[in-house]
């Protein structure tokens, strides 16, 4: 019996087919060059797509904070949650009331003899959020010297200090004691939460910030900001610095201008 493979080979030779031995070196180099060009074209687009996805997650985090804020004021006679201000001394003092982010004296390991790290779990918003990850921007790097030196290592977002006082004289003690303005004293378009400058650990010694204490550089040429009505906006640095420098009251310097009457 004849071998069918031999018959097939004979037929292919008869019809003019020839088997190739493989790619030549020049052909391989051409293919590699094409792949390199395509990679150079695609990588920037992929990088932008990844950053956009992470920014979307950050925006969602701020939206969740906005929901928590509005649920809190609805349940507390229009009163805004304490902003967790006052720095390290208040952060470790359990005699002060809980704020939106944490309960003083119960946030850090070993504080007041507790020997545990509760982070934001004792904060007033955690009952709604139920997740540490919602307090952190996915682009916030935790392998930097600034992160190591930060007292508060469980948030990328800070509350606007305007909830306790005006532009030139912030009454941090009022905030420490839980005295804040009512939510109705602000416009829905006023800015409540933002991503502060993560390069300065001093800005993360509590849960609040003055508007002129810097903005993150994580999201290219701007940052995400949460407003009193719950909506979130991507604000470019240029606009942020214009608002900071504006001597008039605006959506960033949004202090009501009247004495606090709450609580």
Label the model's feature ranges:
Residues 17, 50-57:
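Intracellular coupling helices
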Residues 56-263:
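Short, well-structured segments within or immediately adjacent to enzyme catalytic domains
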Residues 19-50:
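N-terminal single-pass transmembrane signal-anchor helix
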Residues 11, 35, 47, 54, ...:
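Generic anion/oxyanion-binding catalytic loop in active/binding sites
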Residues 1-25:
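N-terminal leader/signal peptides at the extreme start of proteins
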Residues 22, 53, 239:
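Alpha/beta-hydrolase active-site loop signature
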Residues 8-10, 50, 144:
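Local alpha-helix boundary/kink/capping signal
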């Amino acid at each position: 019996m004849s071998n069918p493979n031999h018959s097939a080979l004979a037929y292919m030779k008869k019809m003019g087919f020839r088997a190739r031995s493989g790619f030549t070196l020049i052909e391989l180099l051409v293919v590699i060059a094409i792949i390199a060009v395509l990679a150079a074209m695609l990588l920037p687009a992929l990088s932008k797509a990844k950053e956009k996805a992470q920014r979307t997650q950050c925006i969602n985090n701020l939206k969740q904070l906005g929901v928590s804020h509005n649920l809190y004021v609805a349940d507390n006679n229009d009163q805004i949650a304490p902003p967790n201000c006052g720095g390290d001394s208040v952060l470790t003092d359990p005699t002060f009331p809980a704020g939106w982010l944490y309960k003083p004296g119960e946030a850090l390991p070993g504080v007041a003899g507790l020997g545990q790290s509760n982070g934001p779990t004792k904060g007033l918003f955690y009952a709604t959020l139920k997740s540490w990850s919602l307090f952190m921007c996915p682009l916030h790097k935790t392998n930097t010297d600034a992160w190591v030196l930060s007292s508060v290592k469980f948030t990328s977002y800070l509350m606007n200090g305007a909830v306790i006082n005006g532009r030139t004289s912030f009454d941090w003690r009022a905030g420490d004691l839980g005295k804040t303005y009512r939510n109705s004293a602000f416009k829905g378009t006023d800015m409540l939460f933002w991503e502060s400058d993560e390069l300065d650990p001093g800005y993360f010694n509590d849960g609040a910030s003055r508007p002129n204490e810097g903005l993150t550089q994580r999201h290219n040429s701007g940052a995400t900001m949460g407003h009193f009505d719950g909506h979130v906006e991507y604000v470019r640095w240029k606009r942020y610095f214009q608002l900071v420098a504006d001597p008039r009251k605006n959506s960033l310097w949004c202090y009501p201008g009247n004495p606090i009457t709450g609580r």
